Structure formats: structure tokens, C-alpha cells
Amino acid sequence: MALTQEDIINAVAEMSVMEVAELISAMEEKFGVSAAAAVVAGPGAGGEGEAAEEQTEFDLVLTGAGDKKVNVIKVVREITGLGLKEAKGAVDGVPATLKEGMSKEDAEAAKTKLEEAGASVELK
């Protein structure tokens, strides 16, 4: 019995952030493509000025852990709900997208918490 598109989507929805990142890497290798190239090409198609004004969803990207790595891991776990191993993997593997599609208020609050813990963070 073949898997349906819905089955695949449900399976991905149950994965942790780290598992999804590993899946993406495996798919890039298998098919010889890069997900980053598709993301970069997307905003160029529309008006960049309009996109900047209308942005309502933000991605929280950890760009550095700083000296207080343990504190950063604790905050990453709090924000994402990841387990210790997954949070440590995200902190060790910077840059790492911690959360996608966040509202501006939630993204700013998470960014502030991470910066207070000693991390460097970007909102995209």
C-alpha cells in the first residue's frame, strides 16, 4: 500500500525540529537539490518593500550561543518544548531555526529571553 500525501504530512507533523532538519538534509542529498536556494528565490518574485511592511510571521533563528551555553539550552527548551538532547543539538548546530511562523509579539519576547540568556538571535 502506497503512502498518501496526507500520511507523509502527518508523519512530518509528529517529528521534532531536529528530525525535520535531518529529513530535509537527507532529501537534499537524495534529490540533489537545496532547500535554501528555493527560499532565497521566493522573496525576489514579489515586491520586497511590500513584504517587509506586511510581515506578520517571523522565524526565530539562533545565530550563536555565547558563553552561557547551559542557560541558552534551558531557554531553547522553554521556548520550543524540545527535549534536552534536541535543544543541545540546536544550540550546538548554529545557525538553527528554533521556531517558524511566530507572531511579532511572541518572536520579540522569545528573542529577548534568548538574548538575556547570552545567545545571539535573528528574526527573519
Swiss-Prot record:
One GO term of the biological process aspect: translation
Matching InterPro entries: Ribosomal_bL12 (IPR000206), Ribosomal_bL12_C (IPR013823), Ribosomal_bL12_C/ClpS-like (IPR014719), Ribosomal_bL12_oligo (IPR008932), Ribosomal_bL12_oligo_N_sf (IPR036235)
Pfam family, any one: Ribosomal_L12
UniProt GO cellular component terms: cytosolic large ribosomal subunit
Composition-biased stretches (Basic and acidic residues): 102-116
Keywords: Ribonucleoprotein, Ribosomal protein
Region (Disordered): 102-124
Protein origin, superkingdom: Bacteria
Gene3D superfamilies, per database record: 3.30.1390.10, Single helix bin
Gene Ontology molecular function: any one: mRNA binding
Function: Forms part of the ribosomal stalk which helps the ribosome interact with GTP-bound translation factors. Is thus essential for accurate translation.
Known partners and oligomeric status: Homodimer. Part of the ribosomal stalk of the 50S ribosomal subunit. Forms a multimeric L10(L12)X complex, where L10 forms an elongated spine to which 2 to 4 L12 dimers bind in a sequential fashion. Binds GTP-bound translation factors.
Family as reported in the entry's similarity comment: Belongs to the bacterial ribosomal protein bL12 family.
Protein name in the entry: Large ribosomal subunit protein bL12
Organism, as annotated: Chromohalobacter salexigens (strain ATCC BAA-138 / DSM 3043 / CIP 106854 / NCIMB 13768 / 1H11)
